[in-house]
Every structure is written in C-alpha cells, then in structure tokens.
C-alpha cells in the first residue's frame, strides 16, 4: 500500500515527562521548555508513555514563543503525535488510521477492498456512526470500522502480537454488533485494526484487558464480519499503511 500521510506541518522532538490525565501529557522541548500537549488517544498506553521516552509533538502558532492558546478544549500547547519505544516509532494520533485507510481505498492500493470507488466517512447505520461506507456499482455495500492499535506484546510462541483494546471499550463492542447486524441485512462488513507501528507480526484481541470485546469480536467473526489488521510504517516524517497481519482469534 502506498501513500504517506504527513503527521504535522511543524514537528518538534521532545521528551515525555508525565501524563496528568487521559488527554494531557507534559513534555520537555529541546530548548528546555516544559509544555502540556493534547493526547488524542484515551487508551492507557502505559508501556509507551514512560518518563524519558522520545516523542514528536506539534505546537500551535509560533514555536519560538511560549504557547498558551487552547487546543482540544484544554490549555495545551499542541498535540502529541508519536512516541519511540526502543527503535520503533509509534503514532498515537488516533485520526491517522482512518486517513490512511481512506487514502488507500481511494488509490486502489488496499487489496481487500479493491474495486470500491466511493468512500463515505461517518456513515450512520442503526444507532451508530460507522467509520466508512464503501460502494461500487458491481459490489455489495461495505461498512468498515477502523480501530487504532498502539500496543504490541509477545505471545506465548514469541510472536509479537498487536493487541486491542488497551482499555475497556463498550462502544467498540457495540460497533461490532452493528456490523454483524449489517451482514444479516446483506451488507459486507469489516473491522480493520490499524497497528500504528511496524514491529507487529500478528494481531489479536487483548482479552486480559477487555474479555467482553474479545468474545464479541469472535462472535461477529462467526457471523460473517471480516476481521482484518494492517501495520503502519511510521517515521518522524510521516506514515504509510503497510501490509496485512495474520489475525489470531483463538484464546
């Protein structure tokens, strides 16, 4: 899959200090200033956001001055975009997976969805807004939910497995049930787990964190919902959607 998505117009390297709440992180810029930045992901990311971790942030306005303008409804200086763990850069921008998926489908470079010519984001179906509706004259309409994945853990066999969710998500399970209902009505439906890093070898639900989501994922897979996963190649300069990952649903 081709097409890079720039992560920000102005990117600055910094050091992660702390996360006082789910949506704010404090970082130290290279010039020594400590500033709060918005964290778009409400996931815990405890294995990523550790004091001293290198990060990439984007600031509002003039980065040479102390920024004070509000961002995301909070007094934050900008956004946290990426964190490095070991030698791997991980995007924590939750809007990025949807952008990359959208671009890939439009470009015809996302093989599982080749042939779809129209992409409608935020499609209302049932009681939910589904991320995408894909349509084409000779193909069944396809509803797609895109999930952002940042955690990768070793499995029992040593394989590095991307895991979702890293916090309980009743909303995520509800979306899965909506997709299963769509299959019963003649739609094609899929959930795509976009791993925002390139060191995963497979994907599987994180049952220890949210067993209900894991069981729901297995249930909808049996009902005909496609479970797909992809890696993302991330560098400080941008990100490219990569190939598919094997999916491990067995407990």
Curated annotation (Swiss-Prot):
Molecular-function annotations in GO: DNA binding
InterPro entries per record: SfsA, SfsA_C, SfsA_N
Domain of life: Bacteria
Pfam families for this protein: SfsA, SfsA_N
NCBIfam families referenced in this protein's UniProt entry, alphabetically: sfsA (TIGR00230)
Family affiliation: Belongs to the SfsA family.
Protein name listed in UniProt: Sugar fermentation stimulation protein homolog
Biological source species: Symbiobacterium thermophilum (strain DSM 24528 / JCM 14929 / IAM 14863 / T)
Gene: sfsA
């Amino acid at each position: 899959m081709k097409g890079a998505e720039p992560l920000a117009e102005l990117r600055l390297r910094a050091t992660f200090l702390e996360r006082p709440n789910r949506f704010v992180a404090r970082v130290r810029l290279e010039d020594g200033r400590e500033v709060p930045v918005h964290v778009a992901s409400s996931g815990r990311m405890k294995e990523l956001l550790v004091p001293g971790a290198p990060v990439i942030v984007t600031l509002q306005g003039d980065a040479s001055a102390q920024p004070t303008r509000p961002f995301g409804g909070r007094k934050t200086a900008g956004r946290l975009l990426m964190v490095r763990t070991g030698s791997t850069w991980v995007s924590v921008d939750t809007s990025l997976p949807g952008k990359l998926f959208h671009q890939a489908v439009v470009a015809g470079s996302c093989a599982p969805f080749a042939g779809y010519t129209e992409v409608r984001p935020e499609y209302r179906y049932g009681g939910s807004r589904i991320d995408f509706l894909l349509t084409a004259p000779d193909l069944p309409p396809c509803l797609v939910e895109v999930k952002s994945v940042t955690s990768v853990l070793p499995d029992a066999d040593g394989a590095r497995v991307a895991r979702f969710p890293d916090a309980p998500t009743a909303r995520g399970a509800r979306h899965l049930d909506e997709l299963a209902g769509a299959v019963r009505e003649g739609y094609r439906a899929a959930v795509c787990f976009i791993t925002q890093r390139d060191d995963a070898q497979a994907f599987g639900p994180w049952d220890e964190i949210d067993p209900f989501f894991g069981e729901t994922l297995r249930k909808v897979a049996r009902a005909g919902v496609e479970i797909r996963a992809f890696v993302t190649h991330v560098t400080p300069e941008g990100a490219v959607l990569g190939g598919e990952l094997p999916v491990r649903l067995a407990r």
